[in-house]
Amino acid sequence: MSKKDCILAIDQGTTSTRSIVFGKDAQALAISRREFPQHYPELGWVEHDVEDIWRDVLATARETIEEVGGPERIAALGITNQRETIVIWDRETGRAIHRALVWQDRRTAHECNLLRQQGKEAMVREKTGLLLDPYFSASKIAWLLDHVPDARRRAEAGELAAGTIDSFLLWRLTGGKRHATDITNACRTSLFNIHTQEWDEELLKLFNVPRALLPEVCDNSSDFGETEAKLFGEKIAIGGMAGDQHAAVIGQACFHEGMAKATYGTGCFMLLNTGEKPIMSNNRLLTTIAYRIGGKTFYALEGSIFVAGAGIKWLRDGLKLITHASQTDDMATRIPDSHGVYMVPAFVGLGAPHWDPDSRGLICGLTLGSTQAHIARAMLESVAYQTYDLIRAMREDGAMRTSILRIDGGMAVNDWFAQFLSSMLKAEVERPVNIETTALGAAFLAGLQVGLWKSLDEVTATWKQERVFAPKMDPAQRRIMIDGWHDAVRRTLTPSAPVAHSSVETTASQAA
């Protein structure tokens, strides 16, 4: 009998699904990836067909399991997923009653604005660490219950189940035996109290969501059950689950207070470990649970950028400026600067610290001398500028005391971007050998549950730096560029947008 010496990680993202098998040394032994369709039925609406997701989960998992020699080598399975995206399904059939509403979906902006006008945001923020924004799951659940025929009655009768993508996949993998989620996914719904660490009755009432819909909430490393034997040839223990950005905290080994990571995928999400006590931001950053292992909870401050890699995808699929994402590196390096061109990629509004769902994208500073390369470079630069805004907000909150940022995700492989980011932040940027840190974090959580790794110290020992980028830009030039960025952002903000203390009204020279 083969030794169970590997962990299978399922990484279900916004635009693709990946399965990766890791060995005990945290090296990837097999990888399979599938992109799936996005659905945009109306302006600002974004949906996923969960059958597409389920099909790709099975296909990629089976391919990687076969590549390493079969299920007998898999000690456990871990799941990480796009957060906030919500699905409601029939408990009897396991079929969704509607396409999943994706985290990028803005259809409930009006409902969130009404609650804000009623003075409800302070209560929501105190309990959840989140803002009243359609980004989060609660208003999406309410929309589904109110717009799918008979859904609310069926939900109250206990006929339906709701959950983020991890919860739906767990239900399918276990053949409907487990309706559970982990604490990091739960805390992104706007229904979960991060202090009591329970579903909150006042929040359930505010959003009109029946408690019967919601899953059990577990530690990130837990016994989540087993897969059905028919799926992969034998049963596989499911030992870990985490939302993608929290899984990346684990994969980047940011286990100590003050450590920070930024993941550049479809969006960019920066999490700063704040230790065992939550810190409430004065700059409209989010307070969230980083992870809970063995009943011990660590918190984080989070800044969310809605468009990072999605902007590169838009350059490829929308503008047809490139045919592959890697071309942006070459385009950026062959010109000395962006020639005064700025792009604000507010395609689905702006995230932290502005939280303006109604702002829209902007390209400014165009002249007859502007080229495709200037636009591509401006897109890359915009992600670094937005990261600067997040770090500045964290520093003003008194939480950011380190001068090192660990990066991962698809954009992290772009050397030009990593160097520009370091210069903008005036901080060292560390890139690990393994940039698949989201999947790796899910693998670590599952491996900790079954004993493949014995402790977080053992996990930390596997983290290896591939390269460190140090600031190189002239300080005066840096200030000019950041001031230009903030001028561009001002043009996109709607008059009603809430203003963070760390707003664009503060010049870069004052904040740098």
UniProtKB/Swiss-Prot annotation:
GO molecular function terms attached to this record: ATP binding; glycerol kinase activity
Biological processes annotated in GO: glycerol catabolic process; glycerol metabolic process; glycerol-3-phosphate metabolic process
Activity regulation note: Inhibited by fructose 1,6-bisphosphate (FBP).
InterPro entries to which the protein is assigned, alphabetical: ATPase_NBD, Carb_kinase_FGGY, Carb_kinase_FGGY_CS, FGGY_C, FGGY_N, Glycerol_kin
PROSITE patterns cross-referenced by the UniProt entry: FGGY_KINASES_1, FGGY_KINASES_2
Chain positions recorded as glycerol binding sites: 83-84, 135, 244-245
Pathway: Polyol metabolism; glycerol degradation via glycerol kinase pathway; sn-glycerol 3-phosphate from glycerol: step 1/1
Keyword presence, Coiled coil: no
Entry keyword annotation includes NADP: no
Catalytic activity: glycerol + ATP = sn-glycerol 3-phosphate + ADP + H(+)
E.C. number: 2.7.1.30
Gene Ontology annotations for the cellular component aspect, listed alphabetically: cytosol
Function: Key enzyme in the regulation of glycerol uptake and metabolism. Catalyzes the phosphorylation of glycerol to yield sn-glycerol 3-phosphate.
NCBIfam families attached to this UniProt entry: glycerol_kin, PRK00047.1
Family per record: Belongs to the FGGY kinase family.
HAMAP family attached to this UniProt entry: Glycerol_kin
The protein's name: Glycerol kinase
Species of the source: Gluconobacter oxydans (strain 621H)
